[in-house]
């Protein structure tokens, strides 16, 4: 975990080339919209205690800002850049500093592919209440798209598949995937790439329905059993 912490302590996405920022923002937008739909059923449960596990600098803060949410990340650098001033904790997902059966919902976006995911899932299960929900997003091992900017990391990085989450203690209640943009488009000048992305978005949604779990990012909702 030290190499993961060190990597994200030096994480400076604003220095990335424009095409990478465009693709990352597009991926985040697709993920955000998908999870927003999953969270709609909890709209009347504002007293839910939620953990955003691996919150980074708060890219997905708007998903959980209306809940009673704690934001956790291993990188102090990222947490310092998170605009929220409170309810932030710097900690390791493999050793979560919470009592058993604490949370109603855990959100874990693009984290498990960088750690011992089974150990992390065991920790998350420990802190979830009975029948508590877990929503995860990971880089998909079974993706039809192999976009290198989401795979070529300088740290441990293991894409995961839906089968990796068929484990004791959790039941999968929903799965889908997003991001089917062909890699060839990234050679386009940024101004053209931004237009391509704009027109591709409805296409991506259609492909997500046709190729349910074959997109670049796998989204899974699980319940603690």
UniProtKB/Swiss-Prot annotation:
Superkingdom field = Archaea
User: Which InterPro entries does the annotation name?
Assistant: Methyltransf_11, SAM-dependent_MTases_sf
Please give the Gene Ontology molecular function terms for this protein: methyltransferase activity; S-adenosylmethionine-dependent methyltransferase activity
Q: Note one Pfam family from the annotation.
A: Methyltransf_11
Protein name, as recorded: Uncharacterized protein MJ0638
Which species does the entry assign this protein to? Answer: Methanocaldococcus jannaschii (strain ATCC 43067 / DSM 2661 / JAL-1 / JCM 10045 / NBRC 100440)
Question: What does the organism's lineage look like at the top?
Answer: Archaea, Methanobacteriati, Methanobacteriota, Methanomada group, Methanococci
């Amino acid at each position: 975990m030290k190499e993961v912490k060190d990597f994200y302590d030096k994480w400076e996405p604003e220095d990335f080339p424009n095409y990478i920022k465009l693709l990352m923002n597009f991926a985040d937008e697709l993920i955000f919209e998908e999870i927003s739909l999953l969270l709609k059923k909890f709209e009347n449960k504002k007293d839910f205690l939620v953990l955003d596990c691996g919150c980074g600098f708060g890219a997905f803060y708007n998903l959980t800002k209306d809940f009673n949410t704690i934001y956790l990340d291993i990188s102090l650098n990222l947490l310092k850049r998170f605009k929220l001033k409170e309810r932030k904790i710097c900690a390791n997902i493999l050793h979560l500093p919470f009592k058993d059966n604490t949370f109603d919902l855990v959100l874990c976006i693009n984290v498990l592919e960088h750690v011992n995911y089974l150990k992390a899932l065991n920790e998350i299960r420990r802190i979830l209440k009975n029948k508590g929900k877990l929503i995860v997003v990971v880089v998909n091992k079974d993706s039809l798209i192999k976009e290198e900017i989401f795979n070529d990391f300088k740290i441990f990085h293991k894409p995961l598949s839906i089968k990796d989450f068929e484990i004791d203690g959790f039941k999968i209640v929903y799965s889908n995937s997003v991001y089917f943009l062909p890699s060839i488009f990234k050679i386009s000048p940024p101004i053209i790439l931004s237009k391509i992305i704009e027109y591709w978005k409805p296409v991506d949604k259609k492909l997500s329905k046709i190729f349910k779990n074959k997109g670049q990012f796998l989204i899974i909702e699980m319940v603690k059993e």
